A protein has these predicted regions:
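Positively charged n-region of N-terminal signal peptides that target proteins for export
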Residues: 1-4
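A ubiquitous, low-specificity "background" feature that marks scattered single residues
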Residues: 8-9, 288
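Domain-level marker for long, solvent-exposed, non-transmembrane regions
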Residues: 18-336
Length: 336
């Protein structure tokens, strides 16, 4: 009886251990490393396991996974409608596509799932040959797109639309470089044959040459010691544009600032309410191309401290909200 019980326990234990798929601990046994890249992810639920598996597989290529939020809306739309090629990805859950950029998902498939008493497991797999084909085709298609963008002959070379077109080309070239880096890990010989693609650095250099020839008239009324004008000027410089004091320039950015100081009834602090509205116009078409505004409030126990806080707040608003808004505006301009 004891012998029978012992045999039964051993049999049950062996069944329990057999339930854990081989791929959980050794995925290359199921998907040979000669043909596949694999990575296992685990988590408290299936979504966590899937995301971990995808991120672990992307890490094989020696770089951290980019958030999809860092991809411009222009590029996201171009990838969605097929204007920019990234191959055809699997249907990933929203929890993955919101956190991982499309180019990091190329070639990845979630193939296996397993759950034990403690965790959920997922296996991400990449077929090397199939992914190589996807990357080569995408890089070539995108490079042709870049060439078309930079070789187009616009009616007005020194315009914001032309600048935006080169910026779009730079984004596509940058995407190609990321895919080429991935291809180098999969097949370095194939990657060598694509080394003559447009570089994002060379396209950016051409873009900045154009920007230097696009002066923007800048004037801010009601400014506080010229601070907003200074911060906006620095912002335009980051995009490569130069600021001018000549009203006759084609592009002009004008704004109005308002500062209201007040002392609360307790007289313990000094407060300042501030607001700003600005707009960029193209005098050739007498239209407002871009408008931006912000407001805020600062307080301090003494006026000098209040001035410092306001200055810091204005710098933060321009480098944050205004910069992002202008960047989005440039991305919205027609590039075709």
């Amino acid at each position: 009886m004891k012998k029978f019980l012992l045999i039964s326990l051993i049999f049950i234990a062996s069944l329990a251990s057999a339930k854990t798929p081989q791929w959980v601990k050794n995925p290359s046994k199921v998907y040979p490393s000669k043909d596949f890249f694999t990575a296992v992810g685990s988590g408290k639920n299936q979504q966590q396991a899937e995301l971990a598996a995808v991120e672990n597989l992307a890490a094989i290529f020696g770089r951290s996974v980019r958030s999809s939020a860092k991809t411009s809306s222009r590029m996201q739309q171009a990838q969605k409608d097929g204007t920019v090629s990234v191959g055809k990805n699997s249907d990933f859950s929203q929890s993955i596509t919101q956190k991982v950029a499309v180019e990091d998902l190329i070639g990845i498939e979630l193939k296996e799932y397993y759950t034990d008493e403690k965790k959920h497991y997922a296996l991400a797999v990449m077929d090397k040959k199939e992914t190589e084909k996807i990357l080569v085709a995408s890089i070539r298609a995108n490079d042709a797109k870049v060439e078309k963008l930079v070789c187009a002959k616009p009616s007005d070379l020194y315009s914001l639309e032309t600048y935006a077109r080169y910026d779009y080309a730079r984004e596509i070239a940058s995407l190609d470089e990321k895919m080429l880096s991935k291809l180098e890990v999969i097949n370095s010989e194939t990657a060598k044959g694509l080394k003559n693609i447009y570089s994002s650095a060379s396209v950016r250099s051409q873009m900045l040459d154009i920007a230097k020839m696009i002066p923007i008239y800048l004037n801010i009324e009601g400014d506080l010691d010229g601070q907003i004008k200074q911060y906006v000027s620095e912002m335009f410089s980051q995009f490569g544009f130069r600021v001018s004091d000549m009203k006759e320039e084609r592009y002009g950015f004008t704004g109005t600032a308002d500062f209201v100081q007040r002392i609360p009834e307790d007289k313990k602090t000094v407060q300042c309410l501030y607001s700003f509205k600005g707009q960029l116009k193209d005098v050739n078409f007498l239209e407002t191309m871009w408008a931006v505004s912000f407001e805020g409030r600062e307080s301090s126990t003494e006026e000098k401290g209040l001035s410092r806080r306001i200055s810091k707040a204005l710098a933060s608003k321009v480098s944050g909200e205004v910069f992002s808004s202008f960047e989005g505006f440039l991305s919205s301009l027609r590039t075709e």
